[in-house]
Amino acid sequence: MIIEVVLERLDVKHDVFSKIQTHRKKGSIVTSNTSTIPREQLVKGMSESFAKDFMITHFFNPPRYLRLLEIVSGSEVSSDKVQIVSDFCDINLGKEVVVCNDTPGFIGNRIGTYWTLVGMVEAFKSNLTVEEADAIMSRPIGAPKTGIFGLADVVGIDLIPHVTNSMISNLAKSDPYCVAYLEQEELGISQLFSDMVDAGYTGRKGKGGFYRLNSSSGSKVKESRNLKNGNYSISIKPKNLQSVRAAKRGLR
């Protein structure tokens, strides 16, 4: 089984697939770790034999902690091969496998990217700090404690534009995701991502992201980024947020 995990760009993936197609053993299964690109586009231009052996296995990030894995196959892929991949991911890798339709973002990112996008838009409009936004958009709604900005740091801020472009290129302009994206553009959030990446702030794998650890004083101090001016200051956990208190009590 060959798993492709390169950049979330269709042209880059096609280049890798062409090389795999030349060297792979006949009948070997090939999968892509794409998080948003439809399978139909991934196999376009590839041989019929390649398409019969090709599926999507979307590992959620970070894969060493998150159990969820999405599988997307096609009508030309035999059910036996789908079962082989599903069993391997379940038994050998310990994943919780969900078989999805071939739609933009599949299930997880069709919901997750929209939720994150809208959350960031509302944070900007409400003048929230990244800590306030993450406190609200995390445990109180049953989401991971990273929230939205912390999650962006984990995933990689440099990856976000590629994921976004993949989604908007495969959805109707009237889709709520595309509508929210236009609002993000107007608020300057897309430009913020670009500026951060250019400066090396790609998240945890870089100099930091919306959060960073500053060790200039000799000890590591957690700092957060001001969404308006881009400056960093000591990260302060918000207290007495009404929505957080309500979540702890339970919605009754």
Placement of each model-derived feature along the sequence:
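N-terminal glycine-rich phosphate-binding loop for ADP-containing cofactors
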Residues: 1-252
